[in-house]
């Protein structure tokens, strides 16, 4: 405190003790000469007139706790005594700041709150020597600071108000690292796009449930292959059955054709008929060419017609029992030109 400020203080305000209240609510009584060494306390006494009694104690800032206040007053007691040499003060200061980093930081903060600049400078120089030559990671480890800065924030350019060449070089290095960081981020984004998860919902559910999607796919493919084989076997079986039916029909047709051929030959041998036609069972008044053979005796012709009809009737009844309803009755006809034809049901159009 300067001599001018000391002269302003009235005699009645000069007390032997000043009452101070810390942030935790505790009240301390400190010598006036020691307390007035702190500019903040001196201003409170002069401007507000507080600190003269316990009921009007001076409220100290939040960062000043009782332990730090005791250290600050020890420093003030030593330095407020006149007549000490600079060497003595320097030795005392070196011993005074021998403490751990945490307490040194708290002391710096408390001295700054009380506006005690000599002590702030002393503790700040001590902190500067501690962090000198350390990397940001080491500094955070020393002061137990969390690494809450992103890579881009760490590489932001520094302000170079004094045009320091070292800061210029450092900013160039930061710019290069920022460029490399952006390139790495681009590569990562490309890799993420390439490795897009294309699994189906079933595979994802299987993965969540702890099953192997490959096993599920294998079982599904086996089921599909089994179904395909069953369908192929069913279609082949159906094809074979259809072929067997067709072959059976062809056999029955060929047998029927042989029967008809044999019947026709037998009929020709037994009756010695000169000819046969398919339209024998058409009405007697209708003939294919409208021709009537006048050389055949009508009585003999009538007898032959009856024999042919009777034979055809018996032949038809035997065919129904042998091949069912697949064939129509075989009709024989004899026309006047001495030729004969046979009809075999649906194949009547073939001669």
Curated annotation (Swiss-Prot):
The keyword rRNA-binding does not apply. Belongs to the SKP1 family. Expressed in young seedlings, roots, leaves, floral stems, inflorescences, and siliques. Keywords: Nucleus, Ubl conjugation pathway. This is SKP1-like protein 21. GO terms for biological process: auxin-activated signaling pathway; jasmonic acid mediated signaling pathway; protein ubiquitination; response to auxin; response to jasmonic acid; ubiquitin-dependent protein catabolic process. InterPro entries: SKP1, SKP1-like, SKP1-like_dim_sf, SKP1/BTB/POZ_sf, Skp1_comp_dimer. Residues 108-167 are annotated as: Interaction with the F-box domain of F-box proteins. Residues 330-342 have a biased composition (Polar residues). Residues 217-230 have a biased composition (Basic residues). Pathway: Protein modification; protein ubiquitination. Residues 216-240, 330-351 are annotated as: Disordered. Part of a SCF (SKP1-cullin-F-box) protein ligase complex. It is found in: Nucleus. SUPFAM superfamilies: POZ domain, Skp1 dimerisation domain-like. GO terms for cellular component: nucleus; SCF ubiquitin ligase complex. SMART domains: Skp1. Coiled coil: none annotated. Involved in ubiquitination and subsequent proteasomal degradation of target proteins. Together with CUL1, RBX1 and a F-box protein, it forms a SCF E3 ubiquitin ligase complex. The functional specificity of this complex depends on the type of F-box protein. In the SCF complex, it serves as an adapter that links the F-box protein to CUL1.
């Amino acid at each position: 405190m300067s001599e001018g400020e000391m002269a302003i203080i009235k005699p009645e305000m000069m007390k032997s003790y000043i009452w101070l209240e810390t942030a935790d609510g505790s009240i301390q009584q400190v010598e006036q000469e020691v307390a007035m060494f702190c500019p903040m306390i001196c201003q409170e006494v002069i401007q507000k007139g507080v600190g003269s009694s316990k009921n009007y104690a001076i409220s100290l800032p939040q960062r000043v706790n009782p332990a730090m206040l005791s250290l600050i007053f020890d420093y003030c007691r030593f330095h407020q005594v006149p007549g000490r040499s600079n060497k003595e003060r320097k030795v005392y200061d070196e011993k005074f700041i021998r403490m751990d980093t945490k307490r040194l930081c708290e002391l710096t903060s408390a001295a700054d709150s009380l506006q005690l600049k000599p002590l702030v400078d002393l503790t700040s120089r001590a902190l500067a020597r501690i962090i000198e030559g350390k990397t940001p990671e080491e500094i955070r480890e020393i002061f137990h600071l969390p690494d809450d800065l992103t890579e881009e924030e760490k590489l932001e350019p520094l302000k170079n108000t004094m045009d320091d060449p070292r800061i210029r070089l450092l900013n160039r290095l930061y710019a290069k690292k920022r460029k490399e960081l952006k390139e790495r981020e681009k590569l990562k984004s490309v890799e993420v796009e390439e490795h897009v998860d294309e699994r189906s919902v079933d595979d994802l559910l299987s993965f969540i449930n702890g099953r192997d999607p490959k096993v599920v796919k294998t079982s599904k493919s086996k089921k599909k292959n089994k179904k395909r084989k069953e369908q192929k076997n069913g279609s082949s079986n159906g094809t074979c059955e259809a072929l067997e039916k067709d072959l059976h029909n062809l056999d029955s047709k060929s047998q029927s054709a042989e029967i008809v051929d044999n019947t026709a030959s037998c009929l020709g041998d037994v009756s010695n008929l000169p000819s046969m036609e398919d339209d024998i069972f058409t009405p007697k008044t209708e003939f294919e060419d409208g021709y009537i053979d006048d050389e055949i005796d009508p009585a003999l012709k009538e007898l032959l017609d009856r024999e042919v009809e009777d034979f055809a009737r018996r032949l038809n009844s035997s065919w129904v029992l042998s091949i069912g309803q697949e064939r129509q009755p075989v009709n024989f006809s004899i026309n006047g030109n001495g030729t004969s034809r046979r009809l075999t049901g649906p194949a009547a159009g073939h001669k």
